[in-house]
């Protein structure tokens, strides 16, 4: 399977740059999610669907951040990351604002996996929770990730 993932990463890269590696990472994460989802019966729908509470096929952002971090560590351990290292998952959110505005979901803390560009130190969120299982995650600078609220999350990396 790792050979298939490496081949997919090579196929989607349009050059040997950190940006193209992030693009390839997005495709690799989507590919791994499809394979793992099929084996485990995960049919994760996009984003927060509270109707999915108790549904074992639905994951929250903590599950997604944990799984994506694990997948990134696999890519790293197999030498598939040249320009990035795997970082510690991070969270952003504002519980006080959620409480004061009476909308706990909109401003709830949200988790993501993180990669760090080795040359610049720039950290990037790798957020697979936003999209359905097997779709490309958003890979975006952490400063631009989840800056306003849950309705303004970044687009998928294609």
Question: Residue locations for each model-derived region?
Answer:
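Hydrophobic/aromatic-rich core segments of domains that either
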Residues: 73-145
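Proteins with a high burden of low-complexity, intrinsically disordered sequence enriched in S/T/G/P/A and R
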Residues: 1, 60, 97-99
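Weak global preference for isoleucine
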Residues: 2-5, 25, 29-32, 42, ...
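Low-complexity, Gly/Ser/Thr/Pro-rich intrinsically disordered linker/tail segments
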Residues: 142-158
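Mid-length scaffold segments of soluble, non-membrane domains
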Residues: 20, 24-85
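Mixed-charge, polar/low-complexity N-terminal
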Residues: 11, 16-18, 95, 105
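Acidic/histidine-rich, surface-exposed loop or edge segments in extracytoplasmic proteins
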Residues: 1-16, 45-54
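Detector for Asparagine
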Residues: 67, 133-136, 152, 158
